[in-house]
């Protein structure tokens, strides 16, 4: 791996017991978690690991391999930098290249894939009027997700459900109901956080093109004036046959025109539903300059490597930018997703962000 970059470790395992893969075999690692922008549906994180297979050890049909019987669908992976976990997941695909330079390409997915494949069986009648945290726990139970790998917070009560949808869809509803987010952490913990969580997240990194103290320099940035992300009308869809709630922020409509969105959010309490609609109509109603994507190289960043490696989805970062005409702009951002490409001579990172909105309301 590159000099002055974090020390990369890839380990395969079963049942929570891991064995480290020798550095000599690792050709490249690509990970992606989260999403590239806010207000998009949950998708599974992925990790693509390419290994030198001249030894034949990573051919799953090689009965003499120490990995024989282990290198199968569902095998666990743990990827770390400086001993800090940056991805955990399960083997989904294995492509063996038997050419002049034999390689094996392994594709891993995180827990969202397991939740997306699991279906909550339809019920004859709607049942389980419960909090968002309890509903999320029910969905995770149906997906056979381990009880010890959960962190679920959400006290808003949801309407009874007839199920008949994927467990991931249920979890998306839970996140919508609490105005928060659901994700699987870099260490494999299924996490539901409510609206209030955004006010307690750490600011992990300062990115700057001006050489500020304790900052990480970036070499690429994509900014957006924010008009693409304006929404000023929101409808809370609580389900068929019940009253739906909508809200509109007229000042924004006057400036940008009507931009509407619908939340699949079966909120039980009508006051909570009305407040959720108000919040959803207001939080993205202003066009604010945002840093959609920040690109940098994780080489030679010293002690800040720990902060970078520990950065989690929904954490906060700051971006300082000096414009061509001499203005210094600071953008406060929330991490929506991350992608990393690690090779023998580089460690490239892209962080995808949205603007931290300052609004809150009781839901």
Task: Set out the residue ranges of the language-model regions.
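Assembly/oligomerization scaffold segments
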Residues: 1-127, 159-179, 184, 210-219, ...
